[in-house]
A protein has these predicted regions:
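A recognition module on extended beta-rich or small alphabeta surfaces enriched in W/G with H and D/E
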Residues: 152-164
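A mid-sequence interfacial segment
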Residues: 3, 109-124
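A short, solvent-exposed beta-edge/loop patch
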Residues: 120-151
């Protein structure tokens, strides 16, 4: 019985170690040399969300209202590292574990002139709890994570409008 309990505890610890979030990756890498890091807190999102409309223009000059999504965000984490650094190698391995450990779905991948961009989401059919954007261009590796409780339909509509 003691062996079974020990085995179960070890399995739980192993699963927890691989189930990192954008916040945990940010905390792990943001203070390392050669890492550029940006964090936006829930308080900042609440403050921005009180503005009447937060708009951006798409390529056709049409306004896209971001307020419905901003109000649902709980964190923004960005890490940018030189792709040839040891931090980049380690970060890429941790991002791979994150994407493999949760049920992330690849929304799109774009490759152009040596640059690769991938966008992933995690959540259920109605809500998105995490949106991750990864970019590699041969010089830098960029990891961006938006976390919150985003309505999937609203997010997809905003992404479609912004992509026009």
């Amino acid at each position: 019985m003691k062996k079974i309990v020990t085995l179960m505890a070890a399995l739980c610890l192993a699963v927890t170690a691989f189930a990192q979030s954008g916040k945990e990756l940010y905390n792990k890498y943001s203070d390392l040399d050669g890492v550029n890091a940006v964090y936006v807190s829930p308080a900042m999102f609440r403050m921005i969300g009180k503005l009447p409309d937060v708009d951006m223009e798409n390529s056709q000059g049409e306004k896209v209202n971001l307020t419905p999504i901003i109000n649902t965000l709980s964190g923004f984490y960005l890490l940018d590292v030189d792709e040839n650094s040891s931090a980049a190698t380690q970060l890429q391995a941790d991002v791979k574990k994150l994407l493999d450990g949760k049920k992330f779905e690849l929304l799109f991948e774009a490759k152009e002139n040596g640059e690769t961009t991938r966008l992933f989401t995690a959540g259920d059919g109605k809500k998105v709890s995490s949106l991750i954007l990864i970019t590699r261009d041969g010089e830098d590796f960029t990891f961006m994570s938006l976390e919150g409780n985003m309505n999937r339909d609203e997010l997809e509509n905003i992404l479609a409008e912004a992509a026009k």
